[in-house]
């Protein structure tokens, strides 16, 4: 090994040793199994906003996480949604929910999860289809997840969501 290669190798080792310790690995079934609570907000480009609290209960059967979400909005309205996340690989899931059109494909990457899905916001006979792009980030201590989502109508961003989950 030449002197040049030894110097490069030394710098590389020094660089690797100065990197921060790895963050907690996100696994949906580990975080959401059992009881979880959350607070969140939804805002649109027109200025409409809405706050909510969520009580969650997750059941894991070794392959599928069933995650019931009981919403209570600041105006008193209540709603319940149930996600079903089927694990399809070490870092992938397929998710379904009552108001989701088709499936949400979920990809985990370290302390983060990424997924997107279509939702029909109009519960009546009309259609108001938007696409959510969610990013979940697990805290270093593994006790909280911050979910930030962008909402698009076609190519246009129309809303955003933030939800803070706590174990």
List each language-model region with its residue ranges.
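Extracellular Ig-like/FN3 beta-sandwich strand-entry sites
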Residues: 33-35, 64, 142
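Bacterial N-terminal signal peptides
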Residues: 8-18
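Bacterial N-terminal signal peptides that target proteins for export
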Residues: 1-9
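Central antiparallel beta-sheet cores of small beta-barrel/beta-sandwich binding domains
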Residues: 39-125, 133-137
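Glycine-rich, aromatic-bearing surface loops/beta-hairpins
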Residues: 131-167
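A short, Trp-centered hydrophobic/proline-enriched beta-strand micro-motif
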Residues: 32-40, 147
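N-terminal helix-cap/turn-to-beta initiation motif at the start of protein domains
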Residues: 23-35, 135
């Amino acid at each position: 090994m030449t002197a040049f290669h030894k110097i490069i190798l030394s710098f590389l080792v020094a660089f690797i040793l100065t990197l921060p310790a790895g963050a907690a690995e996100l696994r949906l079934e580990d975080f959401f199994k059992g009881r979880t609570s959350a607070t969140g907000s939804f805002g649109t480009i027109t200025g409409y906003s809405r706050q909510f609290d969520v009580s969650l209960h997750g059941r894991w059967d070794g392959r599928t996480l069933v995650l019931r979400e009981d919403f209570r909005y600041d105006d008193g309205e209540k709603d319940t949604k149930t996600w079903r996340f089927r694990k399809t690989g070490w870092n992938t899931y397929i998710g379904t929910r009552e108001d989701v059109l088709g499936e949400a494909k979920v990809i985990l990457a370290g302390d983060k999860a990424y997924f997107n899905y279509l939702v029909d916001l109009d519960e009546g006979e009309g259609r108001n289809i938007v696409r959510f792009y969610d990013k979940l980030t697990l805290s270093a201590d593994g006790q909280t997840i911050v979910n930030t989502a962008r909402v698009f109508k076609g190519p246009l961003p129309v809303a955003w969501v933030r939800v803070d989950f706590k174990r």
